[in-house]
Amino acid sequence: MREHRPIIALDFPSFEAVKEFLALFPAEESLYLKVGMELYYAAGPEIVSYLKGLGHSVFLDLKLHDIPNTVKSAMKILSQLGVDMTNVHAAGGVEMMKAAREGLGSQAKLIAVTQLTSTSEAQMQEFQNIQTSLQESVIHYAKKTAEAGLDGVVCSAQEVQVIKQATNPDFICLTPGIRPAGVAVGDQKRVMTPADAYQIGSDYIVVGRPITQAEEPVAAYHAIKDEWTQDWN
């Protein structure tokens, strides 16, 4: 099931900065928000409770990667926060991912990171010593994620079609690195526009700086949302 709201990456250093940003939006507007490591480490679990209390959906992007028992225990705690979605690194292995699923339960979506969108094929081959193509690595991780019983993966939009072919059409593909046409790509190596991401089959898109650093964030958000959903029936 595709998500009609672009997920806004709350890449802010403090609780107060988040409050100031969200104050720009109408109180009745329900958003889908990503809390990453920077914000979670700065504000703690209370940031999730605060966002849920405002009626927003929360993707807690912590990319857990540890031994299975530790990840399972951590996921039990995250499940109590009421997050709507969270993630692990697929590189942690099938047993770790199964443990994460068991710890989190079935109320929240659980997805895995394949290769970060900041990773190029040359970087992967040199630093991870994975001597395949980037796409082959991503497909391998996606298959293992499906095998472990997770809901989907984080991946580049360019990889969505091959991942769904290798797994199943309902396997979630969440796509970061989304940039409207004409916006600087920043540190992302593999990017795509919202309209292109829709056409290629992404289920969720994540957008950060083009919204949070825009002169008019609310207008930027709705422009991206309109582009993302313009061809929906």
Curated annotation (Swiss-Prot):
Name the InterPro entries for this protein. Aldolase_TIM, OMPdecase, OMPdecase_AS, OMPdecase_bac, OMPdeCOase_dom, RibuloseP-bd_barrel
- What is this enzyme's catalytic activity, as reactions? orotidine 5'-phosphate + H(+) = UMP + CO2
Q: Which GO terms describe its molecular function?
A: orotidine-5'-phosphate decarboxylase activity
Question: Where are the active-site residues found?
Answer: K63
Does Mitochondrion show up as a keyword for this record? Answer: no
Which annotated residues bind substrate? Answer: 11, 34, 61-70, 117, 179, 188, 208-209
Checking CDD domains in the record gives: OMP_decarboxylase_like
Q: EC no.?
A: 4.1.1.23
> Which SUPFAM superfamilies does the UniProt record give?
Ribulose-phoshate binding barrel
Cystine pairs annotated here are none
The UniProt keyword set, sorted, is: Decarboxylase, Lyase, Pyrimidine biosynthesis
Which Pfam families has this protein been placed in? OMPdecase
**Enzyme class, first EC level, given as a word:** lyase
Function, in words:
Catalyzes the decarboxylation of orotidine 5'-monophosphate (OMP) to uridine 5'-monophosphate (UMP).
Q: What is this protein called?
A: Orotidine 5'-phosphate decarboxylase
Q: Which organism is this protein's natural source?
A: Streptococcus pneumoniae serotype 2 (strain D39 / NCTC 7466)
